[in-house]
Amino acid sequence: MVESASTMAGELGVSDATVVRTAQALGYGGLPELRRALAGQVEDVTLDERLHHSLARTGNDLLVDAADSLVASLDVLVRHMSGSRFDHAVEILGGADRLLWSGIGPSAPLADYASVLGGRLGRPSLALTRSGPAAADDLLALTPGSAVVVLSYGRLHRHVDALLRHADDLAVPVVLVTDVLEGQLGDRVAETLVCWRGPPGLFASHAPTMVLVEALMMGLARADPGRAESSLAQLEDLRALTGTG
């Protein structure tokens, strides 16, 4: 489901237009709409079914199987990630006074991790990980001059919609990291980075997202190495001061 029309066309030996027309013949407006529909079907798979299907695909060496699955997911990430989009995302984040990382559920620890990395590299950062009514408190953190990275997979959650509305009101740029929401949200964000979490219907792997987050952080460090190195040197001094070096 991650392939673009051009990639799918190349693999099938047909034109891009043929792929789009086929999706339309099935009753969809185009490939993005078909992708969202398929994702919706996958969302209906229960967690226990995901585990069952995942275990059914494993052999005797679970570690090797897990590593092979991760390598395959990272290969998809690298092959389908546009270099210009990645560079644009780094440019957006690099121009912000503060970075906000939004993620709930399993994505919340990734948002926390990204926030820690950002702070260490001299980029003031904050993780927005609350949901429900408490998500409104997180939205208060959005201020002009900041930039938001939204980690959102599968269906569109209400708090993400609210965040995008508030960010638009404040002219705060948003970088969306997602699997299938580009077609639905692409025109509401400054940039979209497609990051797949493994085969649909199986247990999701968040390792590709972590790799992407770390790559974004390295991109920021490369954009301003003096700032990153100065912050890390200060961190070393503070560790010595607190006895944690």
Task: For each feature predicted by the language model, list its residue ranges.
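HTH-adjacent hinge/linker in prokaryotic transcriptional regulators
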Residues: M1-V2, S6-R85
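Internal, active-site/partner-interface "lid" segment
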Residues: A223-G245
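Short, charged beta->alpha transition segments
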Residues: S84-A89, A134-D138
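Glycine-rich phosphate-binding loops that contact phosphosugars or nucleotide phosphates
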Residues: G94-R222
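Short amphipathic alpha-helical surface patches that mediate protein-protein
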Residues: S6, A39, G94, A233-D237
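Alpha-helical scaffold segments in soluble metabolic enzymes
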Residues: R21, E33, A37, S73-V76, ...
